[in-house]
Amino acid sequence: MTDLVIRALDESDAHLFDTLQDPLDARAAHRLTRHRADWKRVALRDGEVVARAAWWGGPDDTEPVNVNWFDVAEGEEDAGAELLRTAPWQVELELNLPADWREDARLRAAAEARFSAARAAGHELLVERYLYRWTPDRGLPQRPGRLDFRAEPDDAVFFEALRRIHSVTLDAHSLKAIQEGGLDRAAQEELDFFRWCPSPREWWQTAYTTAGDLAGIHIPVHNPAGPCVGFIGVVPEQRGHGYAYDLLAECTHFLVERGAEFVTAATDHGNFPMAANFTKARYPVVRERINFAPARRE
């Protein structure tokens, strides 16, 4: 086997990225994603692309947030691993897969080849997630009318609410943040994400019961690809009443009232209550995302 050549791309040779087959239909999944040419890298053997990766960030980011497009040719898992291992950015890897990838043998083999390459590069599986996309033909979810929704200008209110919400959580990213830096880190990471989104700060809302107690928060946002459910969370002492659905319904209405023609969302496979709420609110699963944490550097 000939030697592998790792190559960073720019505008002059960005076309090389598109020469590898796309069995997992990543191009369609990223039709609204804007990738920078100089954040793309390929691995070549005998002049042909055998692995590729595209790192991604928002328009104002100076470094990538994640690598969200990663492919390897059949039998080239080692090339894919080398492509990730030698990259200047060691960030989370997101593999965006068709919803039926487990049932289709061809898709499963392609997905597992990418998993193998990621693990060989030192990445560790973090979580598997459902990706949702609501569209108007699904019908708007009914608003139960049980909660009072309010704009809240004080970030400290959201920070404390997030600490309470994450004190009992099923979310893998939050659990990782708590393990690394406690509840404060988990809450701050959420706030940083909300602030990173280009939508107005005024959209963030708290929700109160008829007794005046905080039930939770919902954060409707636009990310760089469009409108999405940024966060849904119920404080522990108010769980068991189905309020997460109320928050999701309100978040959907809020975005639609401001012109959204679709709303995207995601939740972990293990978050069964939230997955049930998305189903109830008529959000179909359109794809799945497998998140790998980056290799740890000593």
Language-model region placement:
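Conserved acetyl-CoA-binding loop-helix of GNAT-fold acetyltransferases
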Residues: 76-90, 234, 240-257, 275-280
